[in-house]
Amino acid sequence: MFFIIYLIIFSTIILFIIDLILIYFPKSKLEIIPQKYKINSKEVLFEFKIINQSNNKETMVPDLDIELNGLDDGNLINLPYKKELVIDDGEMKQNLKNYWKTIIIKSNSFVKVYLKANVRDELIENKSIWLKINWSNYGHFGFIRKQNCFLLRKNNTIYKAKKLINIPGNNKNYTTIAVKTEILGIFDEPVKTISDYCKDIVKKGDYLIIGETPLAIMQGRYINPINIKYSLYSKLLCYFFHPTSSLATACGMQILINNIGITRIIYA
């Protein structure tokens, strides 16, 4: 009996130590926060911030590249374009046309980046844009690569259900209907988007449910799996969950570990 108690206490201490190591292990605290955008007939304007949330560590961005594709009815369209970047750190502006210059972002500060992309021989005003930022961070944590993707919706987007899908169920007193939408992004306001899509569908007494993933995307909480640093613990623990669960992947498990720690997961 005492052996079991000692074993539980010892295991708990070990798990706490592992949690502390994961919490304080050096990591990049740079984040990209989109601000606004504008799509003209042959031009895309996009503004974002690179924020350093560290209280005492500077971090370098040695490389940053932006890719643009047209998005029409869910299909990516190749867009030949010429881009120009302007970096504003609050003290001076740098105009970068052909390459990215390594920048240093001080602790608890940010830089603004302005993208201007001129599209060649393509009218894109009525198309959405899929914008991908491939960048790297270098600092006390080492060197890592990151990727952020944003949907820049076309100017004349009308939020209207593309398709209504009846989902069969066991309860004959209820009817379940799935509302197919356009691809959603961080610039879509959740309440307005849901209201516009469902205003002609939902009736009094209906229950309206939105999926966790599209809501997280619109709220900017979605985490690109490329940006997650996986540990051995996430790869082991994910085996103990149902195959269809997001926790059955190292990606989903690592996010849970980052949020609540291994100790709570083990004893849950």
Predicted regions and their residues:
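N-terminal and secondary-structure boundary signal
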Residues: 2-268
